[in-house]
Amino acid sequence: IIYHSAQRSDIVTTFLSLCVLNACNADGIVKTIKCTLREHDLKLDNIVGIGTDNASVMVGVNHGVYKQLKADVPHLILIRCVCHSLQLATSAAVAEGLPRSLDYLVGDTYKSFARSFSRQQAYKELFGILNDGEEEPLKIVQACSTRWLSIATAVERVLHQWTELKAHFQVARLAEKCYSAEVLYSMYCDEINKAYLLFLRPVLTEVQRVNKSFEAHNADQTKLLDDLVHLLSSLIKKVVIPTASVDVYTTKVEDYLDPKPYLGYSFEKHVDDMKKTGLAADEEENLRKRCTKFILVLIEQIRQRLPDNIEILRKVSQLAVEKVLYVLKPSLVPLLEAMGIPTPSTRIDAIESQWRSITTVAWKDTSTTQKFWCEVYNYRDSYGENPFGELADFAISMLVLPYSNAEVERSFSQMNLLKTKLRNRLSPNTVNAIMVIRAGLKRNKKGCFDYELPEKTIRLIGTRDVYKVGVSKPSSSTGAPHQPEGLLGQVGDSSPDCDDDDLFTL
């Protein structure tokens, strides 16, 4: 859940609850969401947005979770997780645009070292000899779909150690009589494979940069979608003729293709070197076509996964602190009308008036957009009222939108660390209680080593009351674990400090 905490004067992203579904479909998910909100005294009407992946059960146009929730909350905003979208788009572009041998090259290079300590040691010794012992070899990582854009790091590591890996597999094919090493050595000898990776590296770096900004804890939410559109624009400019004027969302890029696009310094330099050693013209043409196709597929895949209302959401960048404090700035009315949040004309007039006069106050904390709007929210005049109250409420509602599902993935990782193969009998109640405690400690900026237990909790230790819980099993109606009322329920300020009237997102 993401909400504005007046107590902490901050935008808080935290774990709410672990729920057990009775039905693994859209109806079951919606029912569980509604019941969980009721259990935490949160109003369904206060949901501003919902962040999901691209699964049909979540975003299906006919009977998806979003469609059902929007029927109850007409102003609900859907934001598909950009991190998931970029991963899927990149995977599709690699599969359709590039030779399958590249996937084998990167994947089997990892596999050859993954479970063999002797190979790792042999490679480490060879690497030290070739580099005079000045540096250690970087670990070869696995490119897999479960880690967002892990292929970017995998490609970078392989390229950085190309010569050393080539020498290693040359030795391994003779010493071990290994067919896999023989195949990999022949692939490392093919300079066209290296050219593909040199082309991929800067493109994946750009995509990874945007992905990291969406994953970050302290990113400015008002600028994230601008970064995504700039990525799309940058990819288009790589393959179209310089004089072309294209719309990043709708233009058919194939109609404006550059016959010989510039595909990066390292790639072009390597191609020039290959020409000197006999690269045929048809081979170069095929190489460039495959690289161009990769970019075209990537552009199309990103377009398909862009939020339907991206142009509206991009207008949220008007709320960035540096733009707010401009004396001359565009009206906020188009954004107010586009968001679809119930706003009577009188309220729009009030917000627009406050938007124009906000520069009349000397604001102290303008380091980040979040801190600035929290200061505006808490501002009081001589009469004890906030003259910018409506504007601050609207800005806060935009800042709590779920632009990324990175925190959800982190919660999954925590749960996997808790409920392992050795601890596979942990009940949902216990796992939920531990995760709630961790989230509460994090919200309070405490740790297990410096948190002071309440006196009431200390008195319970060693008594039977410490084991008392409100409900020992999940609710039959929702499957959502109830918060324990014993010792676990009193540690870590387990309930989010989200007031009844606060807007929030899931």
Predicted regions and their residues:
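Alpha-helical structural modules in large enzymes and assemblies
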Residues: 1-506
